[in-house]
A protein has these predicted regions:
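Cytosolic, long alpha-helical scaffolding segments
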Residues: 1-206
Length: 206
């Protein structure tokens, strides 16, 4: 296979992966925002997770068999795994709502979910423009934007826990919601970790 074509396969796979993650994020926001009416849609998040696992497997197979890669081999590996973490956390959060018998959504849930969707959309654009990362400033702009979104999420997370402990210091859902909010915060961290890999790629080429 010609060198250019072989290198392009990684960008194609990563772009497709980013698109699937955005699809999952749209479903995730719907599940969180309209919960508990969306309880029946929670299993769909596992479907997205499985599909994304296949994307990672394909990327790793190509990585193993390729002599030439468009960016460092370790960066492609780290990027694929970081992107996979995003969907893993979405599924864990959605499944947790069912597992812990949650019957009411707290207001910070949709706030953090929408921040996640915004971050994922930025990641999608970032990955779409990644082939031109040495010249296209939008790559770094989106990577930095994701970091700012994660900072916003930290504030929502802190306020969510503060309100939870104030209103239900000994309530039955305190432990449950602490865990769920932790995972929501970890989800935004996963988005920033993904952007962080790209920030590193761009800086190494500067």
């Amino acid at each position: 296979m010609p060198r250019a074509k072989k290198e392009d396969i990684f960008y194609t796979l990563l772009k497709d992966f980013a698109a699937r993650i955005e699809d999952a994020a749209v479903e995730y926001v719907k599940v969180i925002t309209d919960f508990p009416e969306t309880t029946s849609e929670i299993p769909q998040m596992k479907v997205y997770e499985n599909k994304c696992d296949e994307k990672v497997k394909h990327i790793m197979e190509e990585l193993y068999s390729s002599f030439v890669t468009p960016i460092e081999r370790s960066d492609i590996n780290d990027l694929a795994l970081a992107m996979d973490d995003i969907v893993d956390y979405m599924n864990a959060i959605a499944s947790g709502l069912d597992l812990f018998n949650v019957n009411e959504m707290r207001k910070e849930g949709p706030q953090m979910a929408n921040l996640t969707l915004t971050a994922v959309k930025d990641i999608h654009v970032m990955i779409d423009h990644l082939p031109d990362y040495k010249k296209d400033t939008l790559v770094m702009e989106k990577a930095i934007a994701v970091g700012h979104i994660e900072d916003e999420g930290d504030l929502v997370y802190q306020n969510a826990l503060r309100r939870l402990f104030l209103e239900e210091p000994n309530g039955r859902y305190t432990v449950t919601w602490t865990r769920l909010f932790d995972q929501m915060e970890n989800l935004l961290d996963a988005c920033d970790n993904t952007a962080g890999v790209v920030r590193s790629v761009v800086l190494k080429s500067a």
